[in-house]
């Protein structure tokens, strides 16, 4: 009879074998499931490449979409993927949760940046910000534009000027066709002198030539050119004419030529102009002629100490005294007084300047010291003459006389104190100008003309006490 059951010693090995088989199957299945985590070769590179590709695609998708702007507050807020924040916000990563968070950094500084932001709008990048290169480029373009505009304006201006004027060559050509010659100032003066000196010229033509010549000799160079070709001596000789008009306009030309022109002044003294001028003033002549001659004399004497010496030697002070005392020439009295004042102050300033600069006897200073003007004025009775002229009715004349009295005060003090008429005149003028100065003050003029005259009178009265 066959046995019904296997012995226990044989069943044990079979059970163990079956268990090992099941364990091997289970291990194989698990290894297949986790092969990526437990493989001997690490596919990290390919994994990163896949993730980078996904991130790039995600960023492109976010760029294509309208970014949602998160409005930060003073509290930390979670920042979701795809959300944008304004510039200046404070962003951090929460290490506990791994989430990006955002909040305001300084509310008072950045609040104005996001007040205008609204959800659903694209992030507004500040387009008003420029780099230094942008600014340099813009400035260069601006300068180029300005230069272009300036050049256009300049061209337009030149075109306008060209329309108003014509080329000199074109004018010369037309003048040649019309037999008209363009003359220089020198040529014009030569022509005028020839016309004046011609015996065939009428009186009117001679006077017209002198009148035109006076216009040109105002310029220093033209006056010296007049001297260079002998025209000055021709005009000086015109002072000997028997025609008062010729004397008048010859003196008119000489006065313009002498003015502030030392070279011409020297030649005039050597040419006998001073003697001729004094003769006209000392003789009976029309008043207009004497006015022009006195003008020429003043131009010759000013800033020319040698001429002043010759003036005193030739009896110039006596000639002027006689001129002032003429009843018909009272209008010239103020001009004579003004000339004397200028000569006195000119010498005074020259000596003071020499002392301040400590110059050792220059030639011009020596010439001024040889001019004995103040003693001559005292001897010739000018202390009394100037005091009498203070009675003139014109305010301007009184001003000039007061200036001269002040300049002569050191020389004529004793004479002024003895002059009772001068004291009465000063008292009368003092009362008159006090009233006029009061009217000026009422009108709001603190430094008016009459106050200045009153101050001069008060100062003179004080000096004579």
From Swiss-Prot:
Keyword Transmembrane: no
Region (Disordered): 39-60
Glycosylation sites: 197, 240
Molecular function terms from GO: adenyl-nucleotide exchange factor activity; identical protein binding
Segments of skewed composition (Basic and acidic residues): 45-60
InterPro entries documented for this protein: ARM-like, ARM-type_fold, Hsp70_NEF-Inhibitors
Chief location bin: endoplasmic reticulum
Record's keyword terms, sorted: Endoplasmic reticulum, Glycoprotein, Protein transport, Signal, Translocation, Transport, Ubl conjugation
Localization per record: Endoplasmic reticulum lumen
GO biological process, one term: protein transport
Alphabetical list of SUPFAM superfamilies matching this protein: ARM repeat
Biological role stated in the UniProt entry: Required for protein translocation and folding in the endoplasmic reticulum (ER). Functions as a nucleotide exchange factor for the ER lumenal chaperone HSPA5.
Assembly and binders: Interacts with HSPA5.
Protein name according to UniProt: Nucleotide exchange factor SIL1
Gene, per the UniProt record: Sil1
